[in-house]
Amino acid sequence: MFTLQEICRKNIYFLPDWLNEHVAQRLGLYWEKHGSLQRIGDDYVLIQQDLIISINEALRMAGEEGNDEVVQLLLQWEGNIFYAIIGALEGDHDSLAYKLYSQIRDCHTILPLIQDPKIFEKCHDLDESCNISCLVLNAVKHDMLCILQEYKMLLSGGDIQEVFEIACRSLKYDIVTWMGQNIAIYNPGVIFDIAFDKMNVSLLSIGYTLLFNHHINHINHENIDVNSLLTQHLEWAAGMGLLHFMLETLKYGGDVTIIVLSAAVKYDHRKVLDYFLRRKNLYREDIEELLLLAISADCSKKTLNLLLSYLNYSIDNIRKKILQYVKEYETTLIIKILWKKKKINLIEPILADFIGYHSYTYMKGFMRDFSIHPERIIKMAARESREDLIIKFSKNVCKEPKDRLHYLKNLVYTMKHKGGKQLLIYTIHNLYKASCLESKEMFKLARFYARHDARIQFKSICHDLSKQNINIKNLLLECLGIAIKKNYFQLIETIEMTMNYE
């Protein structure tokens, strides 16, 4: 349980003016050589009614003086124990530092608060489980180059590599530069991997400086081709859209080849592409190759327009390939652009293929995008044996079954493809079966079947009329005349057989 004195010490915020030094000492609110202590708010203390400082600064001072009693008071006032430990280390009060450290058992949480390399090292030494490698790694993280310089000879090759990578990832440029200039690093090229990972051009520049000024012989010894390395970096940068990386790399060599530009196209980095297309005289074949890649990569409208502009929107040489890519990658953006810009029509060659395997929803959007009439879609669907599209598109045009029958019948009259015409008639008959037509409409449909030699459908509708006890002799005679006139011999035979039963 807390004593009354401890409760008072913790919670008293205002001391009366008449409180003398003796009473303050008895309450434990007195700091030798400084005077009375008074808590101000949550974060500050007032010393001898005169000086206001933060609780943590007071803790550091008390620790430096080795004043455990004041340290404990300030900790009750919710001060940070880290500052007390730092102060104890600064004042060489090791016993107090160890006593306080025993309450946290992790020196690494304190290190970011320390600026002095000597105190940094002393603080790290509080943790007996840590070694020199751990000290140096943390020193690098917190910009303590002098510690690295002091202990570099005690580090193994693996430790040096780890420290170098930590320095790169922590963006400690001075340490990275010093290590590259003064220590043999097993894999200095890791600096480039990290530079790209962090997209940090300063680190990339340091890497090139080290590569060409300090480790070029080492890299050649490892059979690494510098030009290939630079080209690889250009390709990476292009693929990531890092134009400033590319410009930095080009200061040291390399060339922006078609492979490099392909990376920019593949990931749709138009600004990179635009920058180098303006400055390089590429062959037309190369730009055509980039355009085809852009189609396959589903690049943006701006990227496609950019490449097309360098071809003056002329695609005669790659027309077939564009159609092939449009079908293979199921993209129509290039077709839209060419149609709107130069009225180049690539719709016809792909329409049949698209209708052959795309859904109604997709084709409805396609029809809207290219302002295609439904009649054209339905006829093409008939050619491609897509009855589902015929039904859905015709229903979209005509909601009422009777209107739909009339609409589809008109399409049959203008349909030249034999298989497509037969499918339309088949669809019409199915629609008729699902509808309730009056005899007058059924007569019209029977004549329609006769005109188009649809024997099965004609026989079916005549049977339906007979079941309703409707006299169809005149209809049969009329249709027989149509069949004779058009030389539909099988239909003639069908009509004559039907007449025999009437």
Curated annotation (Swiss-Prot):
Q: Tell me, using the record's free text, what induces this protein.
A: Expressed in the early phase of the viral replicative cycle.
Give the InterPro entries listed for this entry.
MGF_505
What does the similarity note say? Answer: Belongs to the asfivirus MGF 505 family.
Q: What is the purpose of this protein?
A: Plays a role in virus cell tropism, and may be required for efficient virus replication in macrophages.
Protein name stated in the entry? Protein MGF 505-5R
Annotated organism of origin: African swine fever virus (isolate Tick/Malawi/Lil 20-1/1983)
Q: Which taxonomic lineage is given here? A: Viruses, Varidnaviria, Bamfordvirae, Nucleocytoviricota, Pokkesviricetes
